[in-house]
């Protein structure tokens, strides 16, 4: 099997000053191309360390994606490290120098002398085009390993991987068929509870069940070879049955996007009134393109469930909205949710402890619970479901 590795460079990545989103994206993208990464490393802006790890990984990896260090500043060392590791010098790539000069001229700017460094590549390097930036990429062969050097800017990195590097890999190597990965996301059950229920299922050969907990949700993944797809899809029915009402969506699209599409399909507008969630619902739904109108965030205040229900019913009518959703303030470990619909207003009062999780996580949990209420109503289900450590202490319905 082809051994594909990634090397991230830069002090800011090594010291955790920025999150290495490029590594996460590449690992996921390559996995779905049938190229799962076998190793990831991170090295700072130190020439000796870079040369050492390039030489070391060249003895083990078939392909190494090196990210970062192609800029114009003194701490951008990837080209020099590659040349040093190979025992050769840097040469000026005249065509790329002219392309950079054109790039700056079209934007009404003069190219700084330091940018010339970005056109200096190892003597044996294969040039890789960057259509959206000034940091060209390049490839070199070192021992057994084909190394690709890529810019750290995420938008430039992704374009280069998708349009330049992946075609080269397909041309050079016989790539395996991508694996099958079935995913669903749950809300309201713990990881251990789900695992205890699912561990009794018999997995087909080469198939694994994975769990990813990211409060307040848990993602279940069934991954295996394409040859087992039929058996996996049959097993997936059992997985969904066991997960039961905790399933909130399948795939990777996300709940806000799926709710937004359903609202649009059914021509429902939605108004929001948020206290404890502080605008999280509006943010998540607006990013997904939901048909929102007249959303508000107001200071937290103590309310009975009846007050929240009557208030959101009036708000729906006053704004001529199809639906209206409210999250009250959090007082004495209690909080209200209310959803006003053409069928009536449905409200829940819940209780949960303030000591177990941070404020930010509690806000995320409540936003997810509100979205799940909306999802369940849109699907014709009762708005209340099991939520693990969240206790529903009161419910009410106001007729139309």
Swiss-Prot record:
The record's section on Pfam families has: MoCF_biosynth
User: Belongs to which family?
Assistant: Belongs to the CinA family.
Q: Which Gene3D superfamilies match?
A: MoaB/Mog-like domain
Q: What is this protein called?
A: CinA-like protein
From which lineage does this chain's organism come? Answer: Bacteria, Pseudomonadati, Pseudomonadota, Gammaproteobacteria, Enterobacterales
Q: Which organism is it from?
A: Shigella flexneri
Source superkingdom = Bacteria
């Amino acid at each position: 099997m082809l051994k594909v590795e990634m090397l991230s460079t830069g002090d800011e990545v090594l010291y955790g000053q920025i999150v290495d989103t490029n590594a996460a994206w590449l690992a996921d993208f390559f996995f779905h191309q049938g190229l799962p990464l076998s190793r990831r490393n991170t090295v700072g802006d130190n020439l000796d360390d870079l040369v050492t790890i390039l030489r070391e990984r060249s003895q083990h990896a078939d392909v190494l994606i090196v990210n970062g260090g192609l800029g114009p500043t003194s701490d951008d060392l990837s080209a020099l490290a590659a040349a040093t590791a190979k025992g050769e010098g840097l040469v000026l790539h005249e065509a790329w120098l002219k392309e950079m000069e054109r790039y700056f001229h079209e934007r009404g700017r003069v190219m700084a002398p330091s940018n010339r460094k970005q056109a200096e590549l190892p003597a044996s390097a294969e040039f890789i085009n960057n259509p959206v930036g000034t940091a060209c990429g390049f490839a070199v062969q070192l021992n057994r390993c084909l190394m690709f050097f890529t810019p750290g800017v995420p938008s430039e990195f992704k374009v280069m991987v998708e349009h330049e590097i992946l075609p080269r890999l397909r041309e050079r190597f016989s790539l395996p068929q991508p694996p099958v990965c079935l995913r669903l996301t749950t809300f309201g059950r713990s990881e251990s509870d789900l695992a205890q229920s699912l561990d009794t299922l018999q997995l087909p050969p080469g198939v694994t069940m994975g769990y990813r907990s990211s409060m307040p949700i848990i993602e279940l993944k069934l991954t295996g070879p394409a040859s087992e797809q039929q058996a996996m899809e049959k097993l997936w029915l059992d997985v969904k049955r066991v997960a039961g009402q905790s399933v909130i969506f399948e795939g990777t699209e996300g709940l806000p996007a799926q709710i937004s599409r359903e609202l649009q399909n059914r021509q429902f507008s939605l108004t929001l009134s948020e206290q404890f969630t502080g605008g999280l619902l509006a943010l998540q739904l607006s990013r997904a393109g939901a048909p929102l109108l007249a959303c508000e965030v107001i200071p937290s205040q103590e309310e009975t469930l009846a007050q929240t229900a009557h208030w959101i019913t009036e708000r729906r009518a006053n704004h001529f909205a199809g639906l209206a959703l409210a999250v009250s303030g959090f007082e004495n470990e209690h909080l209200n949710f209310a959803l006003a619909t053409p069928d009536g207003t449905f409200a829940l009062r819940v209780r949960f402890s303030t000591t177990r999780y941070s404020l930010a996580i509690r806000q995320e949990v409540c936003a997810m619970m509100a979205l799940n209420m909306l999802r369940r109503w849109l699907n014709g289900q009762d708005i209340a479901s099991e939520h693990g450590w969240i206790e529903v202490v009161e419910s009410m319905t106001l007729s139309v």
